[in-house]
Amino acid sequence: MRFGITIKPDMPVERIVALTRQAEASGFQYGWIFDSHVLWLDPYPVLTLMASNTKNMRLGPCVTNPATRDITVTASLFATLNLISGDRMQLGIGRGDSSRRVLGKKPVGAGDLERAVKAFRELTAGREIDYEGQPTRLSWAKGSPPVWIAGYGPKVLDLAGRVADGVILQFADPDLIAWCLGFVKKGAEQAGRDWRKIEVMAAAPVWVSDDLKLARERVRWFPALVSNHVVDLISRYRPEELPPALTSFVRNRGGYDYQHHCEVESSNANFVSDDVVDRFCLVGPAEAHREKLRRLASVGVTQFNVYLMCGDEEDTLEKYKKEIVPAFR
């Protein structure tokens, strides 16, 4: 099991850099950052600083999408950052949620996502593509970064199995992750790939404390975030195609205010029960975290990504350094 962090870039860049450096020193191998350019700071200048202030940590957005920026722009950004970082960049990409919704736009389709991933790979490797009828090549690009695809639905998970180096699953529910990986495995088999070589990330917030009530309140915002994707899934799939453990919790959901996206104690999360918090997040004393991580590893998770945005972030890193990470070395 490897460990990563994700930063929400709503804090001073100096603190983002300090947290990233602390995470690397604490045994975290991946440093990710949200990409929602209207709500928060643009991730790419910040990633440049993160790269300049770390030595070995692999870095990237968790996640970008094909529509916010033209794929030639994204490819050029990554090819440049790969040169700056010494080949440490990773592309996390999905259909788009907050970065699209705040503009009144919908997430892109799985077909557009697949075309973007293929173009990204070719461009960052310095190979020519046909871009809307125009031969296009980044002649100076050297080496294509690994691609992680984020998703919940069968189509995108199948796509991840066919073309991705890794899959990003935004929850820490072992049973739901096992369900998701069934589609990843199917896609890999269809493409003649060994699915066991595909990295699997579980991403979720954590709170280490004997005070379970407090811990739950610090992370309750996260299932509300997940609910946006679930509501989208329900609109596109028949009920029997989706597990009730994923869909039933949104039954009493109200509206969602993206201006309070990923915000501790946001009213967006008023409908989220303790049971869902416990399934989707990691809360409680250190041993509860270790046990949940062992269960995640048993279903195939290779990286646990801490959504580091619940307050007291330095303390969370210190607790993981001392009480969690060493158990998985």
Describe the predicted segments one by one.
Residues 3-7, 31-33, 58-62, 89-93, ...:
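Hydrophobic faces of well-ordered beta-strands that scaffold small-molecule active sites
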Residues 106-136, 177, 183-298:
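An alpha-helical appendage that flanks or caps ligand/catalytic pockets
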Residues 27, 50, 81, 120, ...:
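Conserved, mostly hydrophobic/aromatic
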Residues 1-62, 145:
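N-terminal beta1-alpha1-beta2 module of alpha/beta enzyme domains
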Residues 30-53, 65, 97-100, 171-174, ...:
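Glycine-rich, proline-tolerant flexible connector loops at the mouths of alpha/beta enzymes
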Residues 20-25, 47-58, 78-89, 161, ...:
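Acidic (Asp/Glu)-rich catalytic clusters
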Residues 11-23, 74-77, 149-162, 218-219, ...:
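Short, acidic/polar
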Residues 44-64, 68, 123, 190, ...:
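Alpha-helix-loop-beta-strand connector modules within alpha/beta enzyme cores
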